[in-house]
Amino acid sequence: MSLSAAEADLVGKSWAPVYANKDANGDAFLLSLFEKFPNNANYFADFKGKSIADIKASPKLRDVSSRIFTRLNEFVNNAADAGKMSAMLSQFASEHVGFGVGSAQFENVRSMFPAFVASLSAPPADDAWNKLFGLIVAALKAAGK
């Protein structure tokens, strides 16, 4: 359950410019996700039932997006290490199943994340990103969601 060294390198190179401005990019991604998939906001206690305008104005937006991008950074940094990825994916899936979040919500993320990264002029790595999110989706399915 990991990426090849070449795939991990591609993901790392495309992620670097995104993570370099993680606060603004994290907020932008989360808002884009909620605009495209409004129901996903309901999986976050701070955003449940709120409009995009309310979420954008929320002081919690930065906290949530920062946690998400920090966690994603851990996956990126360990993407080629099968042992670490297996443990991280298992823990991640267990936590998210506990929140009621399943593979469908991460399929939504998977469907738009490569284009989001590309929109920031990051090097393309669509197939590698799809594989990384595929590992997350598979872990959630294995955990029952």
UniProtKB/Swiss-Prot annotation:
GO terms for molecular function: heme binding; iron ion binding; oxidoreductase activity; oxygen binding; oxygen carrier activity. Gene3D superfamilies: Globins (1.10.490.10). It comes from the Eukaryota. Keywords: Acetylation, Heme, Iron, Metal-binding, Muscle protein, Oxygen transport, Transport. The modification N-acetylserine is found at S2. Heme b binds at H96. GO terms for cellular component: extracellular region; hemoglobin complex. Belongs to the globin family. Monomer. This molluscan globin lacks one of the heme-binding histidine residues found in most other globins. This is Globin.
